[in-house]
Amino acid sequence: MATATYTSLETYLGTSYEPDVDYVDGELEERNVGEYDHTIVQRAILIWFYLHEKEWSIRSLQEQRTRVGTTKVRLPDVSVFSRDVPIEQVFTHPQLIAIEVLSPEDRHYRVDEKIRNYIEFGIRHIWVVNPRTRAGWDCSDGNWVRQERFEVSGSPLYLSLPELFAKIDEEQVP
């Protein structure tokens, strides 16, 4: 059985990893990225919010390091920040929305752990999208609630999975 090697937070923050990794209590956790289905959906979500940045007064970023606790740094696949949140190299303020795009290798317990970290950090909207089944879940309260359209109450922000996947399908036609 392999033993994990402890890495200090300072070492992690001062090191570039390719691909980047989550930092959890001194251990580096690989993230499942790089497959086409994951990448194309992540890109489409990022573009969805990028096209509305001025209108909705937001910033959308992919795989942005976010310090979700004193010993935890996570990289949501897509983060949506209010423009009021100061820009930092490693964010220490909660984003408005954290979105995880599932890969076939993702395990439910690991995604649940990320969701718990996001909730404890104060992220109010946590959404999970499965590119293969085209299903989505609002996990903002820790439960997996199936959604086709995600909304941020009291604001114009939304993400429609049917619209998103229709745009992806249009791109796939030669």
PLM features: what roles do these ranges have?
Residues 1-174:
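Gly/Pro/Ser/Thr-rich low-complexity, intrinsically disordered segments predominantly at protein N-termini
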